[in-house]
Amino acid sequence: NTRQHYGVGVTQILTRNLIATLNFETVTDEGFLNNPYRSVRYVDSGSALGYSFEPELYPETRTSNAVGLRARYFLPYRAALEAEYRFYTDTWEIEGHTASMTYVHPWGPFTFEGKFRYHDQTGAAFFRDIFSRSEATNFRGRDKELSPLTSYTFRGKVSYEFLEPNKGWGIFKRGTLNFSLDHLFVEYHEFSDITSGSLGDEALYELKANVYQVFVSFWY
């Protein structure tokens, strides 16, 4: 596979406390783009399940374009509020909107961060939860990440600065101990959970997850 990735961005100080950044990027992928281990399903009256499976088949090229706008406003006590919006579109006819809001608040050696992220996208032109027959279309996909979906992410993070600038250890100038928790909820609007029932009675798939991270950062 080959990939070409180009991007450009501009940052502007708007006021004493407000800074904004505008970014644009385009990515082109060529080659074998689908997962050889994924399958689509199609209606099959001869199967006890009512459907059978066959391999996915994706286009061999994909070009995406995205534009993003981010603004950061600095508050008293070294706190900051950041808002971001990103629009995405590609040649597979996926269109996505992502928005997020972040608040950062230092307190002594601690820094607290809270973030909310919202993402909504349409599905790829060749995505189907189930196809009407075998080889029904030129391209076929059932990857849930290609389906229409909406996701919500809530994040909390705390960092403790145990190594202050200019008081380092040898080559290390600064060090922090970090803990974060992300709560993720994804609704797939056209992707069924085939384990939840028989054909026609399946529930739409949902993903709920908590992601914990503990790590140490050093600057040198």
Q: Which residues make up each language-model segment?
A:
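Outer-membrane beta-barrel translocator/channel fold
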Residues: 1-5, 9-13, 26-33, 113-161, ...
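Membrane-embedded beta-strands of outer-membrane beta-barrel proteins
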Residues: 6-8, 67-69, 99-101, 156, ...
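Short loop/turn motifs that connect adjacent beta-strands in outer-membrane beta-barrel proteins
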Residues: 13, 17-19, 78, 109, ...
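Transmembrane beta-strands of outer-membrane beta-barrel proteins
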Residues: 20-22, 81-83, 101, 110-116, ...
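Transmembrane beta-strands of outer-membrane beta-barrel pores
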Residues: 24-32, 63-65, 73-75, 85-91, ...
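Outer-membrane beta-barrel translocator domains and adjoining extracellular loop/strand segments
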Residues: 33-41, 94-99, 125-131, 189-198
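Solvent-exposed loop/turn segments connecting transmembrane beta-strands
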Residues: 59-63, 88-97, 206-209
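Outer-membrane beta-barrel "beta-signal"
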Residues: 156-158, 207-220
